[in-house]
């Protein structure tokens, strides 16, 4: 029953959950700008931001994944119902950004767990520091077939 209701709801709207895993917050600002600002107004296309993983269709992850939040990110991912998609946004989410080499050229970091794809599967990658809202919207649109059609 719940799966059927979710499928019907997905035909009407898409819920995006934003998770910040560490960094400067520039990508978060651009994601919120892409969804809420009057210029882009993703809500007019029935794309909404949610903070409940059980309501989410697409998980947007920003920032390098710190060791402190890695397990929380896994748990959030597991709570999102199938089919789901993950969009990694920004240089930090894709490769660790400026935080990647925090341990130096010869060492590893005691703080950074790595890029998002080391923790959970990533379906779409949106590069940039910070990416433009148009690129973030394009990344979300690219993830839609997996969510809507289960592909």
From Swiss-Prot:
* Classification via Gene3D superfamilies: 3.40.50.12280
* Cofactor requirements of the protein: [4Fe-4S] cluster
Q: Which domain of life is it from?
A: Archaea
SUPFAM superfamilies recorded: HydA/Nqo6-like
**One Pfam entry name:** Oxidored_q6
Supply the InterPro entries for this chain: Complex_I_20kDa-like, NADH_UbQ_OxRdtase-like_20kDa
Q: Which PANTHER family match?
A: FORMATE HYDROGENLYASE SUBUNIT 7-RELATED, HYDROGENASE-4 COMPONENT I
Protein family (similarity comment): Belongs to the complex I 20 kDa subunit family.
The name this protein goes by in its record? Uncharacterized protein MJ1363
Q: Which organism is it from?
A: Methanocaldococcus jannaschii (strain ATCC 43067 / DSM 2661 / JAL-1 / JCM 10045 / NBRC 100440) (Methanococcus jannaschii)
């Amino acid at each position: 029953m719940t799966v059927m209701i979710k499928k019907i709801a997905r035909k009407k709207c898409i819920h995006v959950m934003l998770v910040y895993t560490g960094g400067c917050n520039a990508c978060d600002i651009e994601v919120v700008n892409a969804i809420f600002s009057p210029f882009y107004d993703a809500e007019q296309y029935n794309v909404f931001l949610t903070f409940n993983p059980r309501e989410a269709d697409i998980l947007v992850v920003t920032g390098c994944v710190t060791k402190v939040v890695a397990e929380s990110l896994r748990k959030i991912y597991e709570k999102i119902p199938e089919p789901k998609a993950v969009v990694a946004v920004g240089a930090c989410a894709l490769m660790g950004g400026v935080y990647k080499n925090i341990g130096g050229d010869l060492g590893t970091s005691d703080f950074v767990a790595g890029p998002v794809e080391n923790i959970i599967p990533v379906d779409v990658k949106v590069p940039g520091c910070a990416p433009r809202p148009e690129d973030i919207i394009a990344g979300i649109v690219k993830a839609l077939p997996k969510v809507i059609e289960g592909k």
